[in-house]
Structures are given as structure tokens and as C-alpha cells.
């Protein structure tokens, strides 16, 4: 029996109207005020901004949007962009802007704060947070010995109609980008075909988790922190579920890197570099750890929230985040009928 796909196409254009105004105005010439195009969680970034401004006196204006929308806007604006800094939840949008030649080199002192596996080899931007791919499952529907050993197993017939994901979102598309980088185009195309046959599309990670919690479907592919945040609060959306971590450098153990970079066109390079250094450094990473985002800090001197399994224990595959190809992922998912 084929799975009925929920309507999700409208989600791709949500931020367009609100972002359009950005291209119509220029940043202030004041060196003590910068503009950040922010696709990272707004609440976390506001905490960073408040602490940074208190420490440095530099004011920060946030323009909020999604990874893909803001990345495409920066490419369209080019050297005329009012943005000084770009922050994302996932790496593909950072790679998009990097490949357009729009990022300045990140200061070496900033890069040195972050281990090499959490930033691109090019040095054009840096990781600022990390999130792990997980399989959330309903404990009443899936026994431990039935859990998939690999993300690739979810394309097999035994998982038909039994799992879902937030297909249209940048989060899931980053996971597919990781699969593409690790296994290549043919394997990714085959897996997406199996997904089309087997899975239910949901608007996002939260909707996926809620559906799994209700038992329809049995499981879903999400990022870890949605589950941990709900567990730390009401547990209403996750009480009937548990997390399964893929191991052994499987594509399902992919760790997505949230990125930050300074625009080459910025006339406020010093202030922009200071902001990036702050959020990637100890002070900014402790704000992330001690807040309610439940994402992983990536600075070498900052441990994760103790509720989370250590990042080093996740057996994530090695993926250079600058190699994640958002355009190819979109093409492959469209070809498979997922977008």
C-alpha cells in the first residue's frame, strides 16, 4: 500500500517575504554595529548577542530566516549584501555561500578553538554547534532487536510504512547530503527511492517525533536535541519513545555542523570576526551548553550538557562539511518525488 504524502511544499517559501526587506537596505556604517543573517535558533543567538554586546559594546542586528532561504539570499545579494556574519543550523547552506566565493578567511585564533572535524578544511567558516542524527522509535512498536543497524536499512521492504522524516527541511536534507558525501550518487538515489516507497513525510523534526510518540509511524529520523529538549520539559511529545544511535561511522551516525562565517563584503571585518570568535570560543560555547537548546558545543575546551552522550562516543563518520552539496541533494530528492 502506498504511503500518502502530506503537503509540505509551502514550507520552502515561508521566510521569503520577511527576508526580502533585507536586500533593500544597507547596514549602518558604525563599526560598533554588525548585521547577522541568522538561521540558527533565534533564542540561542539572542543569548550570544546579549553576552557579546555586554562584553564588547558592539551591537548586533539579527535578520532571521531558514538555512536555504538566507543562503540563497546571500548568493543573490553578492557583494551588495548588508550582512556581516552568516550563522546556520546545518552545513550545506554554508557550503553554498562558500562556493559562491562570499566568505572571508576566519581568523586563525578562532579556527584553533574548534577541532578540525567540526569545521571545513578550507578555513572559510567554522563550526559553532553540532547535532547528531538519531532514529526515534515508539517503544511499544519496535523491539530492540528489530532496530535498523544502518540508515540504509530503512529503504528495505520491512520498513515500508513504518517510518518518517521532516523531508522538506534543511535538517533532513543535511542528513541526505552526508549520505551523498559518504556513499555517492547512485547509493543515495537508490536510498531515496526506497524512502519514497517506505516513509511518511512530516513538516519537521518535531512533527515527526510527535507522530512516532503516538505510534504512527513506528519510528523516524530526526536530530537528537528535539528529543532531549522535550525530555527535559513536559515529555508530552516523547514519553513513549526512545532514541537509537547508529554506530560504526554509518551514514545514520552523521553529525551535522552548525556554521558561522564572516562575509568578505563586510566593511566591519574586525567586529564581525570578534563576534564569530566569541560564539565559537569558551564563553559562547558555555552559553550553548548551559541553555535549553541541547545541541553539542564544538569548542575543544567545552564539554556537552551532561544529559547528552559524549560527542566523541557517537562514532560519527568523517565528512568535510564544505563538501556537502545542497543543490545536488535537492535535485536527487526532487527526482525521487520527495520534494
What are these regions (language model features)?
Residues 39-46, 68-69, 75, 81-217, ...:
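Extracytoplasmic ligand-binding site segments that recognize negatively charged/polar headgroups
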Residues 92-96, 219-240:
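A ligand-binding cleft/hinge motif common to bilobed small-molecule-binding domains
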Residues 25-27:
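Bacterial signal peptide processing site
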Residues 136-141, 180, 255-268, 287:
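A bilobed periplasmic-binding-protein/Venus flytrap-type ligand-binding module shared by bacterial periplasmic
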Residues 30-49, 63:
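Extracytoplasmic "Venus flytrap"
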Residues 131, 159-167, 192-195, 201-202, 237-264, 278-300:
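Periplasmic-binding protein-like
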Amino acid at each position: 500500500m502506498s504511503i500518502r504524502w502530506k503537503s509540505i511544499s509551502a514550507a520552502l517559501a515561508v521566510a521569503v517575504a520577511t527576508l526580502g526587506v533585507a536586500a533593500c537596505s544597507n547596514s549602518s556604517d558604525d563599526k560598533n554595529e554588525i548585521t547577522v543573517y541568522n538561521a540558527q535558533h533565534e533564542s540561542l543567538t539572542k543569548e550570544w548577542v546579549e553576552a557579546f554586546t555586554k562584553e564588547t559594546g558592539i551591537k548586533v542586528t539579527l535578520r532571521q530566516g531558514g538555512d536555504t532561504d538566507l543562503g540563497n539570499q546571500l548568493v543573490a545579494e553578492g557583494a551588495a549584501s548588508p550582512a556581516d556574519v552568516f550563522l546556520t543550523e546545518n552545513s550545506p547552506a554554508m557550503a553554498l555561500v562558500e562556493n559562491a566565493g562570499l566568505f572571508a578567511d576566519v581568523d586563525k585564533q578562532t579556527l584553533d578553538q574548534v577541532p578540525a572535524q567540526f569545521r571545513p578544511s578550507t578555513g572559510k567558516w567554522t563550526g559553532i554547534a553540532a547535532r547528531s542524527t538519531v532514529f526515534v522509535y515508539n517503544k511499544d512498536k519496535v523491539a530492540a532487536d528489530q532496530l535498523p543497524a544502518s540508515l540504509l536499512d530503512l529503504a528495505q521492504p520491512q520498513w515500508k510504512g513504518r517510518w518518517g522524516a521532516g523531508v522538506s527541511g534543511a535538517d533532513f536534507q543535511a542528513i541526505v547530503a552526508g549520505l551523498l558525501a559518504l556513499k555517492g550518487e547512485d547509493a543515495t538515489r537508490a536510498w531515496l527511492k526506497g524512502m519514497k516507497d517506505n516513509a511518511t513525510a512530516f513538516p519537521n523534526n518535531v512533527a515527526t517525533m510527535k507522530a512516532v510518540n503516538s505510534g504512527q509511524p513506528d519510528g523516524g529520523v530526526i536530530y537528537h536535541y528535539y528529543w532531549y529538549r522535550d525530555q527535559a520539559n513536559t515529555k508530552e511529545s516523547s514519553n513513549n519513545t526512545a532514541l537509537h544511535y547508529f554506530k560504526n561511522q554509518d551514514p545514520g551516525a552523521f553529525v551535522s555542523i552548525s556554521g558561522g562565517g564572516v562575509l568578505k563584503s563586510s566593511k566591519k571585518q574586525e567586529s564581525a570576526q570578534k563576534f564569530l570568535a566569541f560564539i565559537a570560543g569558551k564563553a559562547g560555547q558555555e552559553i550553548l551548553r548551559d541553555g535549553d537548546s541541547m545541541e553539542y558545543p564544538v569548542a575543544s575546551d567545552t564539554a556537552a550538557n551532561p544529559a547528552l552522550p559524549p560527542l566523541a562516543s557517537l562514532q560519527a563518520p568523517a565528512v568535510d562539511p564544505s563538501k556537502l552539496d545542497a543543490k545536488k541533494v535537492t535535485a536527487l530528492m526532487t527526482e525521487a518525488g520527495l520534494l
